[in-house]
């Protein structure tokens, strides 16, 4: 099985690339970082330190790498059995032209073996969005072949992989938590489903996408924004604060009630899942910076993302949401001079006021009662 993975960063190496390699795939990473590509090709292996209850180090061998915008990556697309990505939502659309070019040449060369593409991003239906971007780049005469031979498989992914600390002795090493979850929509594959260890199949993906978004992502971001206000630097420090931990637990429980209503998740099992996530945030072996988790607040306040989307669910079902409102108020306070979105958000607030900035970022309507509550909470936090 030939696998091409876009994004040789920490998630690519420590999660998706690792699972592919451990499933005996020939893994080639594609990345824009020339130094990283050269290092991978020179060593042809890297170390993954798995931390938690059962610590160990895995050696991932027999890997290669290519430049993301080179002829080499096109050749890999022509030959691949599976193509995966972990490049971030902002970059995903930018690789569509490369994928389209590779698929066009694949068809022109007569390779009609099925190939499946899986975007492993913090997005709802990210692969479906990638498909539309690829179709926009691919000449129309190849669209029917794409529909028949190329599977665009949506997924939900969950593993905390903080940025690696600088390590001159082993620059490719990455540290990950022991927990991981990769769930894919089994109905979207073309041909045989690739035998990838750790890749779980479901026919109800959206429930698991929202479970992850409303729980891990919601909890993570509320921890980050409340932690930032309290002066903490890492997620572990913030979640050790009893007041913050309780607010984060309540936010996840409130978003969880939406999941129980919408998808029929078992409330008791979901509460256990929440407690597991709180334990993961407190992992003493993971140094996860608050500014890594909190960055890009405009995206994270968006109507389809981890704060506003669960809030809209509570409004839909008439459920409590005070902890979620507190998280959104804390997001409006987020300041980070190195993050363009944080700077832009604070500019909106200074220019137009907090309510106008809130409405612009979230898409909420001014007459929603929760808007006044968020603004009041924001003022209380000031």
UniProtKB/Swiss-Prot annotation:
This is Mannitol-1-phosphate 5-dehydrogenase. One of its GO terms (molecular function) is mannitol-1-phosphate 5-dehydrogenase activity. NAD(+) binds at residues 3-14. GO terms for biological process: mannitol catabolic process. The lineage of its organism: Bacteria, Pseudomonadati, Pseudomonadota, Gammaproteobacteria, Aeromonadales. Its EC number is 1.1.1.17. Keywords: NAD, Oxidoreductase. It catalyses: D-mannitol 1-phosphate + NAD(+) = beta-D-fructose 6-phosphate + NADH + H(+). PROSITE patterns: MANNITOL_DHGENASE. It comes from the Bacteria. One of its GO terms (cellular component) is cytosol. PANTHER family: ALTRONATE OXIDOREDUCTASE-RELATED (PTHR30524:SF0), MANNITOL-1-PHOSPHATE 5-DEHYDROGENASE (PTHR30524). Belongs to the mannitol dehydrogenase family.
């Amino acid at each position: 099985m030939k696998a091409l993975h876009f994004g040789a960063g920490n998630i690519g190496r420590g999660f998706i690339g690792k699972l592919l390699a451990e499933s005996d795939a020939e893994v080639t990473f594609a990345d824009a970082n020339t130094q990283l590509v050269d290092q991978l090709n020179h060593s042809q292996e890297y170390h993954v330190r798995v931390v938690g209850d059962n610590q160990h180090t895995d050696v991932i061998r027999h890997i290669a790498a290519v430049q993301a915008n080179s002829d080499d990556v096109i050749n890999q697309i022509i030959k691949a059995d599976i193509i995966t990505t972990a490049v971030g939502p902002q970059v995903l659309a930018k690789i569509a032209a490369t994928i389209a070019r590779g698929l066009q040449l694949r068809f022109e060369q007569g390779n009609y073996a099925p190939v499946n593409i899986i975007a492993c991003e913090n997005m709802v239906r990210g692969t479906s969005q990638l498909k539309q971007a690829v179709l926009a780049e691919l000449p129309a005469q190849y669209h029917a072949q794409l529909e028949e031979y190329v599977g665009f498989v949506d997924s939900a992914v969950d593993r905390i992989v903080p940025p690696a600390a600088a390590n001159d002795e082993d620059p490719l090493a990455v540290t990950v938590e022991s927990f991981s979850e990769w769930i894919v929509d089994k109905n979207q594959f073309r041909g045989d489903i690739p035998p990838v260890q750790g890749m779980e199949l479901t026919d109800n993906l959206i429930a698991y996408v929202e479970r992850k978004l409303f729980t891990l992502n919601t909890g993570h971001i509320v921890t980050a924004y409340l932690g930032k206000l309290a002066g903490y630097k890492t997620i572990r420090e913030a979640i050790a604060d009893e007041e913050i931990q309780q607010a984060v637990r309540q936010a996840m429980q409130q978003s969880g009630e939406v999941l129980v209503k919408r998808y029929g998740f078992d409330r008791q099992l979901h509460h256990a899942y929440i407690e597991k996530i709180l334990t993961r945030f407190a992992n003493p072996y993971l140094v996860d910076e608050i500014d890594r988790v909190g960055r890009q607040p405009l995206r994270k306040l968006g109507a389809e993302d981890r704060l506003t989307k669960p809030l809209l669910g509570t409004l839909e079902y008439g459920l409590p949401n005070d902890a979620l409102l507190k998280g959104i108020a804390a997001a409006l306070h987020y300041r980070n001079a190195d993050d363009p979105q944080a700077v832009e958000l604070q500019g909106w607030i200074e220019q137009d006021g907090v309510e106008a900035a809130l409405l612009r970022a979230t898409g909420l309507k001014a007459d929603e009662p929760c808007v006044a509550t968020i603004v009041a909470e924001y003022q209380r936090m000031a």
